[in-house]
Amino acid sequence: MLNRTILVGRLTRDPELRTTQSGVNVASFTLAVNRTFTNAQGEREADFINIIVFKKQAENVNKYLSKGSLAGVDGRLQTRNYENKEGQRVYVTEVVADSIQFLEPKNTDDNQQDLYQQQAQQTRGQSQYSNNKPVKDNPFANANCPIEIDDNDLPF
């Protein structure tokens, strides 16, 4: 028997971190995962999947992920039930994460802002070293030019 779930999507809200009575950290969040097909209007629909993660990974998720973050989740599907205040049986299906991959840098906006500020300072005639930040060269600046690679240099 196999119970394994692999998902890639964006968080719909900031993670919620709490601690169990036994002292174990638990983080929960919802992941929006696009379906591979489109509906009749040609739009992609998404599934909103509840995720829970424990211990140190729960702390890391709470620290490094936020609403809109892209994450990969590898875990197992779990269904649990409880009785609510009205005495009704409630069933909850969620993914218990074994590992979570942070698929984009935490400070993407900050990095882009730094690059923009460096470029603006350079165009005003200031030295690129005046702000003591490393210069971020664009490795794809000449992407529209053909790349000269000898067939013997290819690994396949």
From Swiss-Prot:
InterPro entries: NA-bd_OB-fold, Primosome_PriB/ssb, ssDNA-bd
Single GO MF descriptor: single-stranded DNA binding
Disordered: annotated span: 122-146
One family name in Pfam for this protein: SSB
Domain SSB: 1-104
CDD domains the record matches: SSB_OBF (cd04496)
TM regions (residue ranges): none
Key words of the record: DNA-binding
GO biological process, one term: DNA replication
GO cellular component term, pick one: nucleoid
Subunit structure: Homotetramer.
Protein name: Single-stranded DNA-binding protein 1
Organism: Staphylococcus aureus (strain MSSA476)
